[in-house]
């Protein structure tokens, strides 16, 4: 057996603590934060460190900047965090430059410093040892509370852990909660266990689907990825999204499900249009009658009813991936309805981060879900049974 090094086991008193957070939050065109859930999720760990008299250095990425640009600055995050905590947050002008180093070295007990966007440093995504060493030199203790990036071997996630021994590094409360939830979900789900998998591509979820099959009782497949499965069953899908090279794999999954006695549900109708836009003329059509030149962009009302029926006796529901192009209003109905049904069920409901969390927030159902993961990719990889680069260095065999 193995366990995770925890923030609770570290002597934090008056220490300088580096916390890797995930403040990769959505913003509108005026850079206003539209959903601060990830910022709020980090507060318990930050508060715990402050209560122990720590000087707290926070670090995160935001977006995928190719260069240093003000639209990727963490300044709006600093302001929102300060408001949420009713406490000043000092903002550094850089990551490991003169300003950051000066502010980090002068940081006093119970003060908070937020470094600028980690990805302004090219070495972050390259897992660069030198960057990791520079970041590590700022603090006595390292805490990872950024589940959303734990599947990435990045400098502030993996390389940095080499510069702290086991008594000076650990997982924050959010990271521990995420890992606990995912492993319990896979090892001890209340049954029937229903997985709802959507999103655009089969390729990104192939491994998760294969891994889930022996564990679930029912599997609902929606979103753009459903068309590869429908094509595998011999349907004409018009111009709908198709991964031609994965038709064979889709067939294998359908066959494996059958052999395991897992009931697999695919859409029976779709909301179709000729273009993917708000102005497009749309119509509901059975999956066997999608016209040439048209594409399915959401599940239709009959699919919604079928999926609702499939969810009716569920005791555990894991949902990862929207049912359609939810960013466009007229193609969001299937995803919104699914969100309502899942939130109204009596099951333990786990939402696998990313776009799905956005759908749930838009539907106004966030408070009704049992658990909303802060990381889409990371939660998928945990479900796939993979070891996460950010978690592995914080994991010890219980005999150690």
UniProtKB/Swiss-Prot annotation:
Query: What GO biological process terms does the UniProt entry carry, in alphabetical order?
Result: gluconeogenesis; glycolytic process
Annotated keywords: ATP-binding, Cytoplasm, Glycolysis, Kinase, Nucleotide-binding, Transferase
One GO cellular component from the entry?
A: cytosol
Instruction: Report the EC number(s), separated by commas if there are several.
Output: 2.7.2.3
Pfam families registered for this protein in UniProt: PGK
Membrane-crossing segments per the record? none
Q: Which Gene3D superfamilies match?
A: Phosphoglycerate kinase, N-terminal domain (3.40.50.1260)
- Binding-site list for substrate: 22-24, 38, 61-64, 119, 152
Query: By its UniProt entry, which InterPro entries does this protein fall under?
Result: Phosphoglycerate_kinase, Phosphoglycerate_kinase_CS, Phosphoglycerate_kinase_N, Phosphoglycerate_kinase_sf
Q: Is ATP-binding among this UniProt entry's keywords? A: yes
Per the record, the pathway is:
Carbohydrate degradation; glycolysis; pyruvate from D-glyceraldehyde 3-phosphate: step 2/5
Q: Where, by residue number, does ATP bind? A: 205, 296, 327, 353-356
Q: List GO molecular-function terms, semicolon-separated.
A: ADP binding; ATP binding; phosphoglycerate kinase activity
What does the record give as the reaction this protein catalyses? (2R)-3-phosphoglycerate + ATP = (2R)-3-phospho-glyceroyl phosphate + ADP
| Methyltransferase among keywords | no
Q: Where in the cell is it found?
A: Cytoplasm
HAMAP family associated with the record: Phosphoglyc_kinase
State the oligomer form and interacting partners.
Answer: Monomer.
| Sequence similarity | Belongs to the phosphoglycerate kinase family.
Name this protein carries in UniProt: Phosphoglycerate kinase
- From which source organism is this entry? Campylobacter lari (strain RM2100 / D67 / ATCC BAA-1060)
Q: Which gene encodes it?
A: pgk
